[in-house]
Amino acid sequence: MHKGEMTVDVVCFPHTLATFPMFTMAAQATFLSIAHQKKLRCERFLNEMDRIIPWQQMLDVMRPHYYDNAVGRPAKDMKLMLKIYFLQQWNDLSDPAMEEAIYDRCSFQKFLQIDLLSDTVPDETTILNFRHLLEEHRLQEQLFAIVNALLAQKGYLMKKGTIVDATLIAAPSSTKNREGKRDPEMHQTKKGNQWYFGMKGHIGVDADSGVVHSVAGTAANIHDRVMLHTLLHGSEKAIFGDQGYACDGDKDACRRNGEIHWFVSDRGRRNHPLSNGQRKKNRKRSSVRSKVEHPFHVIKNLWKHTKVRYRGIAKNTLQLYALFALANLYMKRRQLLA
């Protein structure tokens, strides 16, 4: 060995994992168990949602706009197509990925009541055309209204107070696409020390139940405060929001009204920091305001809707109506199933 050279000890393992059948069998059993548990959770979720979604009311609203089969091939069953659309929302699937998933996932076939041996699976073009039909007639807004009417009837939408909030939804910032440019309706905004490009989803949430009653979509550079009145239903006795909604004019208007309590967190200003009393009030208000995070958690963390799927604010806002309609049902599923 020459001076300065390193020595490396090589340890050889003459046996592979295959020589340890107990180990491999245990590992396989673990993987199978995890896969089985995941399948059971998916099937349970789909079964519960199938039972609580007001299918008949939704189909009645859609029927006047659906294909009448006067010419061309017979249209696919309306309920089947609506179920496929909902599967896309729950799993963040594109139209081609949705078609493929129907073939691959038994839980989807069971939910859709499709037999691959005898039934024809809708292709990606059929799935796309159905979504365009929903968008053309803004049916997602009507589906949202149907869900909230059901929840109000059951006593889960009190309308005594509203919590307002917004979330950023990212859009592709690259220009490497067919048009060679970014979506002109999307814009950038700064949050903390980081810049984001995309849109905002704004919601008004029932302060008692946490149910979303108002939805709006804007470019990311629109200030939260601008959307406040759009998110109110008009019968509130209290308004909750973070510092982004702080506005002396609105606060004074509530005081003059005398019937609406303003619980929006106070904002500190340059040379005018918050007092200890204001900080204490803000902490107390944030405990109520946390309910607005639940629907965002459902659509962004559970259903992975963190990026826009379409170009333009309008189409993505309509998708938000569908997502929050389903999120409302999901959050109240135990009560609805009881």
Question: Positions of the model-derived regions?
Answer:
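Charged, often Cys/His-bearing segments associated with DNA-binding zinc-finger transcription factors
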Residues: 1-56, 63-64, 338
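Polybasic low-complexity intrinsically disordered regions
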Residues: 13, 29, 87, 96, ...
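Helix-centered, glycine/charged polyanion-binding patches within enzymatic domains
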Residues: 27-29, 237-238, 243-314, 318
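Secondary-structure capping and boundary motifs in well-ordered enzyme cores
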Residues: 51-54, 73-80, 118-122, 284, ...
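An N-terminal domain-cap segment
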Residues: 59-79
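A short glycine/serine-rich beta->alpha loop
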Residues: 67-72, 116, 310-313
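Alpha-helical support elements that line or immediately flank enzyme active sites
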Residues: 80-92
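A short, flexible helix-boundary coil/loop motif
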Residues: 302, 336-338
